[in-house]
């Protein structure tokens, strides 16, 4: 494939945008080459500025669960834009989507909308600290909760891709209140609680980690974490920015039957527009201003276009819940097909999957935390990435990102992808 127009656009972008991109992973720095500039997308496919078509497994990093330019979402946004794009006032639409979201997730009473997953997680931490009157939090190495200072401590895909697990600009004072645990290691978490008695406000975790590849929680881990938080009067925060409304109607909480105290949402809940949210029971949410002392605000929070897109998306998922079973079947089919051809071509690999999230690791050993995720062969991944790109398959340009499957993908698309993996893996 030729990428002449993308190359020209990247050179122009570099003159006025740091690194030529507005989110670092898009720059292809870890895989080399020139980033592909998108021109349009529809269904399972994205089209670049050179006219190339790709089967898309990024899906805007997760939101496009029903495919690109999903008609009910597009129609809702167009119609809403005709009556105004932003008001800075409450609207009926905000209440409508809030009611629907609360009805879909069994353990939340109220929800506050923000503009991104980063804002959602940042606000959830502030709320937890205010509610518990404690300062420290526990996060897990390799889990990414946005680019807020508190979270940029071994933050997974973005940080490790660029070799800077702790970002300059994060103060030592902020860092000392962020305690780091190993994913899937409950004893490690117990030790942190024991060493910081009555100081820990919350534990925040991706119930399925998605920023060191796709890492499932081991059996009993989330339940033990829930119990440990309860015993220590700390809040459990699930960052469901990736998993919310994707793994099930009620997200990872429903899938694993474990309930958190605060839940963060993003991606799917916005239907492709900038939306984040955090939610909890009344007792906790009533601590937020204007009801309570914990301040949180946003000029564009509850933006009518974003709310229209999110409402259309959630309605589609709520009214067609068989989509989750279809996604499970499609992703299982894809994962097995990829595993079979990699094995037949003698390529060392491990594939992790939960629902419609999957990752390919070029390592023979199980991948269950940040340290094991880093053992993969990055040189092999680079060849794999560029080989698939040349075949018309677009996966994330980082070995530490998850593939997101959309319902727009047909079995013909999946077979096309498996054949591409077969062809590429013969030369790895």
Swiss-Prot record:
Stored InterPro entries: 4pyrrol_synth_GluAld_NH2Trfase, Aminotrans_3, Aminotrans_3_PPA_site, PyrdxlP-dep_Trfase, PyrdxlP-dep_Trfase_major, PyrdxlP-dep_Trfase_small
Which cofactors go with this protein? pyridoxal 5'-phosphate
PROSITE patterns in UniProt: AA_TRANSFER_CLASS_3 (PS00600)
Q: Name one GO biological process term.
A: protoporphyrinogen IX biosynthetic process
- Keywords annotated in UniProt: Cytoplasm, Isomerase, Porphyrin biosynthesis, Pyridoxal phosphate
Locations listed in the record: Cytoplasm
One protein family per Pfam = Aminotran_3
* Enzyme Commission number(s) from the entry: 5.4.3.8
Q: Name one GO molecular function term.
A: glutamate-1-semialdehyde 2,1-aminomutase activity
- What is known about its subunit structure? Homodimer.
Family statement: Belongs to the class-III pyridoxal-phosphate-dependent aminotransferase family. HemL subfamily.
**Protein known as:** Glutamate-1-semialdehyde 2,1-aminomutase
According to its UniProt entry, this protein's organism is Flavobacterium psychrophilum (strain ATCC 49511 / DSM 21280 / CIP 103535 / JIP02/86)
Q: What is the lineage of its organism?
A: Bacteria, Pseudomonadati, Bacteroidota, Flavobacteriia, Flavobacteriales
């Amino acid at each position: 494939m030729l990428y002449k127009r993308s190359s020209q656009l990247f050179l122009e972008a570099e003159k006025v945008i740091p690194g030529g991109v507005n989110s670092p992973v898009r720059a292809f720095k870890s895989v080399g080459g020139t980033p592909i500039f998108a021109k349009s997308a529809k269904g399972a496919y994205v089209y670049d500025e050179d006219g190339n078509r790709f089967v898309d497994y990024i899906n805007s990093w997760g939101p496009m669960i029903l495919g690109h330019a999903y008609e009910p979402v597009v129609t809702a946004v167009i119609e809403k834009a005709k009556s105004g794009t932003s008001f800075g006032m409450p609207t009926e639409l905000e209440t409508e989507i809030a009611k629907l979201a609360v009805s879909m997730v069994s353990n939340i009473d109220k929800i506050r909308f923000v503009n991104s997953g980063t804002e959602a997680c940042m606000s959830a931490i502030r709320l937890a600290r205010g509610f518990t009157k404690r300062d420290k939090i526990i996060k897990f190495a390799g889990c990414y909760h946005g680019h807020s200072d508190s979270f940029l401590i071994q933050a997974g895909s973005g940080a490790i891709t660029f070799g800077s697990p702790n970002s300059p600009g994060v103060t030592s004072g902020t860092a000392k209140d962020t305690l780091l645990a190993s994913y899937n290691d409950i004893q490690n978490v117990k030790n942190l609680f024991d060493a910081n008695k009555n100081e820990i406000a919350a534990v925040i975790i991706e119930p399925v980690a998605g920023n060191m590849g796709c890492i499932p929680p081991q059996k009993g881990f989330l339940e033990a974490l829930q119990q440990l938080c309860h015993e220590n009067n700390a809040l459990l925060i699930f960052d469901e920015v990736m998993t919310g409304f994707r793994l099930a109607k009620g997200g990872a909480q429903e899938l694993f039957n474990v309930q958190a105290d605060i839940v963060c949402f993003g991606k799917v809940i916005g239907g492709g527009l900038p939306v984040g949210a955090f939610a909890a029971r009344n007792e906790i949410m009533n601590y937020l201003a204007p009801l309570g002392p914990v301040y949180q605000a946003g000029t564009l929070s509850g933006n009518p276009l974003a709310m229209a897109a999110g409402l259309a998306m959630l309605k589609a998922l709520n009214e067609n819940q068989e989509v989750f079973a279809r996604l499970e079947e499609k992703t299982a089919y894809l994962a097995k097909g990829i595993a079979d051809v990699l094995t037949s071509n003698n390529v060392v690999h491990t594939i992790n999957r939960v629902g419609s999230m999957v990752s390919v690791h070029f390592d023979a050993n199980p991948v269950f935390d940040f340290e094991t995720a880093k053992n993969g062969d990055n040189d092999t991944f680079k060849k794999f990435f560029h080989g698939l790109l040349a075949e018309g398959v677009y996966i994330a340009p980082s070995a530490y990102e998850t593939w997101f499957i959309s319902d727009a993908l047909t079995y013909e698309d999946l077979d096309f992808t498996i054949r591409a993996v077969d062809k590429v893996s013969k030369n790895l």
